[in-house]
C-alpha cells in the first residue's frame, strides 16, 4: 500500500537480555500484540532456528492487546546445549536413562548386541575405499559466535577515517577519508606503525570518501562521498580505478550493493541513483523524501531508505513504487540486513535497533537508551551475531538471543566498523586511525 504508514506489532526488548517493563509502544491505534513464542519465531528465523507453534492461537480481548516483553531466560534458552541447560538448572536426562531409552547403533548381528572388535573383511575394506570423499564445500559447519575480542593493532591513517572495509580472503584493510584511501595487508594488522601497502589518491585532493562497500567476491571496492563521482576500484592484482560513475549530486551519503554485485544504490540528498555495475550505466535517478535519504540498503528486489524524518521506506526495485513506510519515531542513522536478507536492521539516534521482516509485517526493537551522533551496524556473514557501534563503544550481540558476546571501549568516537567475511577480524575507524581486533572463539 503506497503512501500509507505500516501498522505492525512492535516489541521492545532491553539489549543484552535485560527485560523491559510492559508498555505501549505505538500511540497510534491498530497495534496488535503477538504471543511471545511468535517473537521467538521471528528471531529464530535469523539463523534458521526451528520453531514449533504451541497450538491454536488464543483470542485476546481488546484489553489484552498491549505490547509485552520477553524475559532474559525465555530468549536465552533458544540455543542452549545440554551442558548449558544443566548449568541453567533445567531438567536433563540422566546417563542411565539415556542409555535405556536410546537404541544402540553399534554393529552386531542384532540391534543392541555388543560390537565385535574383529578386523573387517577385505570385502568391507574394498567397499569403504570405493566411497568417494565428501567435498569440503558441502560439509555443514557450525555457525559459531565469538565470545570475546583481542586488540591486535592500530592502522595510522593520518586523517579522520569515515569508512572502512576488511576482506576475509586476504585480510586487507581499506581505510577511507579525505584525499586518499590506504590499503593495509595482514602483516600490518599485527605490527605497530607499519606503512600501508598502497595509497590510492582520490580524483581531487578535496574529495572525501564517507561510505564504501566491498563486493561479495572481495575483488572490487566501491566508494562514495563528497565527490562528483562514485568510484569503482579493482583490488587485484594491483588496486586501481576501474570506473568513475559520474553522479548528479554533490555528496553520496550511503552505498548498497546487491548480493550478485549487479546493482549499486547510491544515496544522495533527496534521491537514490541506481547503477548497473556490469555495464557501468545509470539505470534510474529515483526521488525519495529529502529528509529520508541519509542511508540505503538492498534486500533482493526491495531497497530501503531512511533518515531524519524517522521513517523507514521500502521500494520495489522493479516498479520503483513505494511499498511501505514504517515510522520508527527516531532519526535513522544506519541500515543493514542479515545474510539471509530476511531481516532489516535500522540503527536510531537513540541507539535503539529496530528489526523489520522483509516479507512479513513483523518488527521489534532492542533498547539501548542513549542518544548518539554515530550509529554503525554490521551483520556478520555467518549470521550468528552482529556488531553495533555507538559513540566510543562497540558491542557484539548474538542472534537471535540478543545476548551480549563482547564489548569494546575506545578512547575516541567510532565512526565506522566492519567484520571480515571469515569472521576473524573486526576493524573500527575513528579520528585518525583504524583499530583492529581479533575475534576469539
UniProtKB/Swiss-Prot annotation:
InterPro entries tied to this protein: Groucho_enhance, WD40/YVTN_repeat-like_dom_sf, WD40_repeat_dom_sf, WD40_rpt
SMART domains (alphabetical): WD40
One GO cellular component term noted in the UniProt record for this chain: transcription regulator complex
Family, similarity comment: Belongs to the WD repeat Groucho/TLE family.
Keywords: Repeat, WD repeat
WD repeats: 156-194, 204-243, 247-285, 286-325, 409-441
Pfam families: WD40
Any one GO molecular-function label of the UniProt entry: transcription corepressor activity
Stretches for region Disordered: 1-77, 91-119
Protein name as it appears in the record: Transducin-like enhancer protein 7
Comp. bias intervals (Polar residues): 62-76
Residue ranges with Low complexity bias: 27-49, 108-119
A biological process term (GO) from this entry: negative regulation of canonical Wnt signaling pathway
Domain of life according to the entry: Eukaryota
Coiled-coil portions: none
Amino acid at each position: 500500500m503506497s503512501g500509507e504508514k505500516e501498522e505492525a506489532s512492535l516489541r521492545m526488548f532491553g539489549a543484552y537480555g535485560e527485560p523491559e517493563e510492559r508498555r505501549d509502544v505505538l500511540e497510534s491505534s491498530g497495534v496488535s500484540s503477538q504471543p511471545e513464542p511468535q517473537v521467538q519465531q521471528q528471531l529464530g528465523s535469523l539463523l534458521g532456528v526451528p520453531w514449533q507453534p504451541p497450538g491454536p492461537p488464543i483470542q485476546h480481548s481488546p484489553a489484552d492487546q498491549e505490547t509485552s516483553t520477553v524475559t532474559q531466560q525465555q530468549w536465552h534458552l533458544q540455543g542452549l546445549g545440554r551442558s548449558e541447560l544443566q548449568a541453567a538448572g533445567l531438567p536433563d536426562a540422566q546417563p542411565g536413562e539415556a542409555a535405556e531409552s536410546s537404541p544402540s547403533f553399534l554393529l552386531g548381528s542384532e540391534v543392541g548386541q555388543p560390537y565385535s572388535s574383529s578386523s573387517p573383511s577385505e570385502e568391507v575394506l574394498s567397499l569403504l575405499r570405493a566411497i568417494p570423499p565428501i567435498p569440503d564445500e558441502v560439509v555443514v559447519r557450525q555457525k559459531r559466535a565469538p565470545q570475546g575480542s583481542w586488540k591486535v593493532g592500530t592502522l595510522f591513517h593520518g586523517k579522520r577515517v569515515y569508512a572502512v572495509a576488511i576482506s576475509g580472503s586476504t585480510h586487507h584493510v581499506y581505510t577511507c577519508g579525505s584525499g586518499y584511501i590506504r590499503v593495509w595487508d595482514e602483516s600490518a594488522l599485527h605490527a605497530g606503525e607499519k606503512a600501508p601497502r598502497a595509497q590510492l589518491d582520490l580524483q581531487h585532493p578535496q574529495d572525501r570518501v564517507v561510505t564504501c562497500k566491498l563486493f561479495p567476491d572481495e575483488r572490487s571496492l566501491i566508494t562514495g562521498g563528497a565527490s562528483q563521482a562514485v568510484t569503482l576500484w579493482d583490488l587485484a592484482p594491483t588496486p586501481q580505478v576501474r570506473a568513475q560513475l559520474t553522479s548528479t549530486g554533490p555528496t553520496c551519503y550511503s552505498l548498497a550493493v546487491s548480493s550478485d554485485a549487479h546493482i549499486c544504490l547510491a544515496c544522495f540528498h533527496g534521491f537514490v541513483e541506481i547503477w548497473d555495475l556490469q555495464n557501468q550505466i545509470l539505470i534510474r535517478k529515483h526521488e525519495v523524501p529529502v529528509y529520508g535519504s541519509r542511508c540505503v540498503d538492498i534486500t533482493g528486489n526491495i531497497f530501503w531508505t531512511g533518515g531524519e524524518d524517522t521513517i523507514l521506506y521500502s521500494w520495489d526495485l522493479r516498479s520503483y513504487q513505494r511499498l511501505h513506510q514504517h515510522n520508527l519515531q527516531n532519526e535513522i542513522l544506519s541500515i543493514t540486513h542479515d545474510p539471509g536478507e530476511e531481516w532489516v536492521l535500522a540503527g536510531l539516534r537513540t541507539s535503539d535497533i529496530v528489526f523489520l521482516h522483509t516479507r512479513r509485517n513483523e518488527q521489534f526493537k532492542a533498547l539501548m537508551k542513549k542518544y548518539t551522533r554515530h550509529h554503525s551496524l554490521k551483520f556478520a556473514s555467518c549470521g550468528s551475531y552482529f556488531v553495533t557501534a555507538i559513540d566510543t563503544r562497540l558491542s557484539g550481540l548474538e542472534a537471535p538471543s540478543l545476548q551480549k558476546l563482547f564489548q569494546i571501549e575506545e578512547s575516541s568516537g567510532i565512526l565506522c566498523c566492519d567484520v571480515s567475511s571469515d569472521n576473524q577480524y573486526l576493524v573500527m575507524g575513528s579520528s585518525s586511525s583504524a583499530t583492529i581486533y581479533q575475534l576469539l572463539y
